[in-house]
C-alpha cells in the first residue's frame, strides 16, 4: 500500500513539475505587443543615422508614440531578437534599423522604415 501511495506521489509531482516548466517556458516566450512603436538602432549604424535624420524633420513625429531602443544595451538587444523572432526573422538576419509596430509588424532597413512612417 505504501508503494502505491509513493508511486502516486511521484507521478503527481512529475505532472505538476512538467506543467510548471511548460507554463514558465511559454510565459518567457510570449511577449505582448507594445502600446506604441519600438525603434531599434545603433550609434555605429549609418542606415540608422539616415532614419534619425528623417525622424528629426518628420512632421508626424508628435502624432505617434515611438520608443527608441539603442541595441548596445543587452536588454534592448535581447528584446530586439525576441521581437524579430515573432516575425519569423532568424537571429542571423536581425539587424538595425528595425521598427516594431503596435500591430506586431517588423520593418527592417532605412528606406522601408522611412516609407512606412511617411504613410502614417
What is each residue range found by the language model?
Residues 2-5:
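Feature marks short, highly hydrophobic, charge-poor N-terminal signal-anchor/signal peptide-like helices
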Residues 7-21:
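Hydrophobic membrane-insertion alpha-helices, especially the h-region
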Residues 100-120:
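Non-catalytic, surface beta->alpha helical segment in thiol-disulfide oxidoreductase systems
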Residues 27-69:
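Local sequence-structure signature of Cys/Sec-based thiol-disulfide redox active-site neighborhoods
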Residues 83-104:
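Short, structured active-site "lid" loops
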Residues 48, 76, 107-110:
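Extracytoplasmic/secreted cell-surface and envelope-processing proteins
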Residues 51-55, 77, 81, 114:
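Extracytoplasmic/secreted envelope proteins and their assembly/folding machinery
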Residues 63-82:
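Thiol-based oxidoreductase modules, predominantly thioredoxin-like and allied folds used
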Amino acid at each position: 500500500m505504501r508503494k502505491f501511495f509513493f508511486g502516486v506521489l511521484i507521478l503527481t509531482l512529475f505532472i505538476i513539475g512538467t506543467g510548471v516548466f511548460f507554463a514558465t517556458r511559454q510565459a518567457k516566450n510570449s511577449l505582448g505587443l507594445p502600446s506604441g512603436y519600438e525603434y531599434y538602432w545603433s550609434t555605429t549604424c549609418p542606415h540608422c543615422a539616415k532614419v534619425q535624420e528623417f525622424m528629426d524633420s518628420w512632421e508626424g513625429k508628435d502624432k505617434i508614440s515611438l520608443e527608441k531602443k539603442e541595441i548596445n544595451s543587452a536588454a534592448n538587444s535581447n528584446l530586439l531578437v525576441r521581437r524579430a523572432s515573432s516575425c519569423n526573422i532568424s537571429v542571423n538576419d536581425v539587424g538595425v534599423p528595425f521598427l516594431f509596430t503596435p500591430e506586431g509588424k517588423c520593418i527592417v532597413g532605412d528606406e522601408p522604415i522611412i516609407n512606412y512612417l511617411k504613410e502614417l
